[in-house]
């Protein structure tokens, strides 16, 4: 949600022009996004009204599309996985001192600065996988840095709900989803005790538990 709040309207205006949007459509979209008033209401208390000078309203169909338009030109000479405000960059190298990925990180920072966005350092991780003979150790690979600060190196990381481990096994992911499903089984138990119908129990099971166990199963169930 934070990323949606940081959409720079001036950067968006440039994107509209770069992609050849009709002037009328560009003006209409910018008018929809700009000068929006907002306030917070809790019970009978209402905060002062503030005007938003950036961002896109959430809960609208236009919001996600506007954000995708903003990040559409974010690309590198490396495989890049983008999903809304999540970006993963992948590099394969035979030399542990290869600087390709570090250059991609620098390009990402430069792109973010030009487009009025900022990278969340707390959520930015480095996952290094050594394979094919394991002639090198992870410690042989220089750490990636952002502004002179090292990016945290982890042994596993969750990408779109799937935990990828350094050893290329799915043990951690399987333990994670089994634990998550077991916690939700308690809900089923309580519903059965309350006398809910079997059909409703099955529907809730499929929605809350089976969906967790089957999510991306073609990837990790191998």
Task: Locate predicted features.
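Active-site palm subdomain of RNA-directed nucleic acid polymerases
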Residues: 64-91
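Inter-domain linker/hinge segments that demarcate the starts of reverse transcriptase
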Residues: 98-116, 182
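Short, conserved micro-motifs composed of acidic
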Residues: 44-45, 93, 103-106, 118-155
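Short, conserved non-catalytic motifs in the polymerase core
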Residues: 4, 40-66, 90-94, 153, ...
């Amino acid at each position: 949600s934070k990323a949606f709040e940081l959409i720079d309207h001036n950067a968006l205006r440039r994107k509209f022009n770069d992609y050849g949007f009709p002037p009328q459509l560009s003006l209409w979209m910018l008018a929809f996004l700009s000068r929006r008033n907002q306030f917070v209401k809790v019970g009978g208390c209402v905060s002062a009204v503030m005007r938003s000078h950036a961002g896109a309203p959430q809960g609208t169909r236009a919001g996600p599309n506007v954000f995708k338009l903003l990040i559409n030109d974010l690309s590198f000479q490396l495989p890049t996985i983008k999903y809304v405000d999540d970006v993963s960059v992948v590099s394969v190298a035979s030399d542990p001192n290869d600087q390709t990925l570090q250059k991609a990180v620098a390009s990402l920072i430069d792109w973010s600065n030009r487009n009025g966005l900022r990278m969340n350092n707390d959520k930015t991780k480095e996952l290094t996988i050594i394979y094919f003979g394991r002639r090198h150790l992870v410690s042989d690979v220089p750490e990636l840095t952002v502004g002179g600060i090292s990016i945290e190196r982890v042994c596993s990381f969750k990408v779109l709900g799937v935990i990828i481990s350094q050893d290329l096994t799915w043990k951690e992911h399987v333990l994670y989803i089994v634990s998550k499903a077991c916690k939700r089984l308690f809900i089923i138990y309580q519903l059965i005790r309350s006398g809910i119908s079997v059909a409703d129990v099955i529907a809730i099971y499929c929605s809350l538990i089976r969906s967790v166990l089957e999510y991306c199963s073609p990837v990790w169930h191998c």
